[in-house]
Amino acid sequence: MSNLPFTVAALYCFAPLPQYESLREPLAQLCCANGIKGTLLLAAEGINGTVAGSAGAIEKLIAHITAIPGLGEPELKYSHASEMPFHRMKVRLKREIVTMGVEGIDPLKSVGTYIVPKDWNALIADENTVVVDTRNDYEYAIGTFEGAIDPQTRTFRAFPEWVKQNRDRLEGKKIAMFCTGGIRCEKATAFVKGLGFDDVYHLKGGILKYLEEVPREQSMWNGECFVFDERVAVGHGLAESDVELCRACRRPLTPQDKLSQFFEEGVSCAGCYAERTPEDRARYAERQKQVKLAEKRGANKHIGS
């Protein structure tokens, strides 16, 4: 049982929701009434999101979601935070609950074989297994599994094209895929199976469940796991990390990254310095100045974030 005041719930469920638009307002009202913040995505294919609040508030929300007709029990990962990791609550209507951009991909019809965390090490240690990180390059940069391939994608939409261009690396192998909480792998494995690959596996519950259940001394995970909230990243046991965001480009920064000559808080980092003009950096510097002034006054500290 954590002593930290905020419970963070990452959840998803693929299920036919033909009337998903009607679910938006009741969810938004429940979250607002109970002080819950974060993002929930609704689409005809299901629900996805990460939210935070008191333990009791999150319990109410999960009960509400589970009771939605046709939805059932969502895939859930819990962690905890010392501060509220979101600034506001958003319930959005989308075409997909995780955007791959490939028509006809349905994890309810075809998906890879789930591998629970305790069995994951044996699979990825097998010399006939190719391990694929389905996340984006900035996520891979701060942590991944031993021997994992980095597809070097900036968005999940780019992943299908990477697979097509790298079929020769996957042929005749066991294909083990992983992502943060499992949802991207639902579609990634469905897509790969649709190309004719049979030995396709994915980590059930994603990296978050692995870090929660597998002891550090047995772990094959190196680094931190990027999360899409103000905690930025978590480590073994889902402990908060010392990784921060570059507020100019939103890349994750380790303490080592902040030693770069190109790092200036709120203005630039080694990853984005060359991508920005002097005018951009001057604008970011002024924004950072306003952030610091707001913090001194005790105002919101997420200006421009």
Curated annotation (Swiss-Prot):
The keyword tRNA processing applies. GO terms for molecular function: oxidoreductase activity, acting on paired donors, with incorporation or reduction of molecular oxygen. GO terms for biological process: tRNA modification. The keyword Cytoplasm does not apply. Keywords: Oxidoreductase, tRNA processing. The active site is at residue 179. Gene3D superfamilies: 3.30.70.100, Rhodanese-like domain. Pfam families: Rhodanese (PF00581), UPF0176_N (PF17773). PROSITE patterns: RHODANESE_3. It catalyses: uridine(34) in tRNA + AH2 + O2 = 5-hydroxyuridine(34) in tRNA + A + H2O. SUPFAM superfamilies: Rhodanese/Cell cycle control phosphatase. InterPro entries: Rhodanese-like_dom, Rhodanese-like_dom_sf, TrhO, TRHO_N. Its EC number is 1.14.-.-. Catalyzes oxygen-dependent 5-hydroxyuridine (ho5U) modification at position 34 in tRNAs. Belongs to the TrhO family. NCBIfam families: PRK00142.1-4. This is tRNA uridine(34) hydroxylase. The gene is trhO.
